[in-house]
Design a protein with these regions (language model features):
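Extreme N-terminal basic, low-complexity initiation segments
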Residues: 1-13
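Functionally critical mobile loop/hinge segments
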Residues: 281, 286
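DNA major-groove recognition helix of helix-turn-helix
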Residues: 229, 241, 280, 292
Length: 312
């Protein structure tokens, strides 16, 4: 597959569960990345591109207790864990009752805090929303803002996958098993063309497309559009567009050494900087300035862990 990157082995901690999952950890990982989000319709697919963001196998022998934060994204993670449970909570700090092992989590228009109390060993499949709908063949409203244990699905394929991954001797072997499973499960399935149209329009416009225009193009009412989007993605088109615009702001901020928040707000079609701040508080749980400060610290830790720190 020409769109698949080489598998790399690093002491790495980037872009895991979503934007910031693993950055505070000294983690060994191997990852396969797939192509971008563009979706050719139809069932004659030879690639997982557009259905799977990537697959990562993580391992660490020891870990100091830590809490990391995931901000709103378009990743639907499937986690198969081989070690201690995580503690995970939406829009708050996780408590003792928030433990979970292997799970799937749908889209969430907010942030998620993840706590680790012991060693981490897992395989993570990052599905796109379109890929997740095909993978589970169930309405994505069943997963939105939820952590669903994999055992709850009573899915023979998932149980077999978990067993094979658990028996695998290396991270590379786990990746090969996961790719083969995804190809069997996803390739050959027809993508819902109307869901793909809505998804592509929102992503291509970075959240600025008028939802009324989409309903007109499809010949639907607003009510029908909202119902179809909730089934396909787990949230309404308007909410999807807000997250897409927020993600565009994140991309611009990450590409700048010192983000110009007023300029970013204008470039992302926010009404003003206060509007941008409101979305950051909703989707990241903190102000843009606080988010920027925290991510800079995390990048510095990552560079220290990989030996890529600035020369002193």
């Amino acid at each position: 597959d020409a769109e698949r990157a080489d598998v790399v082995t690093t002491a790495w901690a980037g872009s895991g569960f979503a934007t910031l999952f693993w950055w505070d950890l000294d983690m060994n990982a191997e990852r396969i990345r797939f192509g971008d989000w563009r979706l050719p319709c139809g069932s004659n697919r030879a690639s997982l591109s557009g259905l799977v963001h990537g697959i990562t196998a993580y391992d660490t022998a020891t870990i100091n207790p830590a809490v990391d934060r995931e901000i709103a994204s378009f990743v639907v993670p499937v986690i198969v864990s081989f070690a201690d449970p995580f503690r995970i909570a939406f829009d708050r700090g996780p408590g003792a009752d928030d433990r979970i092992g292997s799970f799937v989590s749908g889209l969430h228009p907010g942030y998620v805090d993840i706590a680790y109390d012991g060693p981490v060993s897992c395989l993570q499949i990052d599905l796109t929303p379109i890929g997740a709908r095909l993978f589970f063949r169930r309405p994505m409203t069943e997963f939105a803002t939820r952590l669903v244990p994999l055992d709850d699905f009573h899915d023979h394929g998932l149980k077999e996958l978990s067993a094979k991954l658990g028996d695998a001797a290396t991270r590379s072997e786990r990746l090969r098993i996961a790719v083969a499973f995804l190809e069997r499960r996803l390739l050959g399935q027809a993508i819902d063309p109307k869901a793909a149209f809505v998804w592509s329009a929102i992503r291509r416009s970075r959240g600025t497309v008028r939802i009324d225009r989409l309903t007109e193009d499809l010949g639907w009412s607003r009510k029908r559009m909202a119902a179809h989007a909730r089934d396909a993605f787990g949230m309404t088109p308007k909410r999807l567009a807000r997250v897409a615009r927020f993600q565009h702001a994140i991309d611009l901020a990450q590409s700048a050494q010192r983000p110009d928040w007023a300029g970013i707000a204008a470039a992302c079609n926010y009404s003003d900087q206060a509007h941008l701040v409101r979305d950051f508080n909703a989707f990241a749980g903190e102000t843009p300035a606080r988010w920027s400060f925290r991510t800079q610290l995390q990048r510095a830790k990552q560079n220290d862990n990989t030996g890529q720190g600035a020369p002193g």
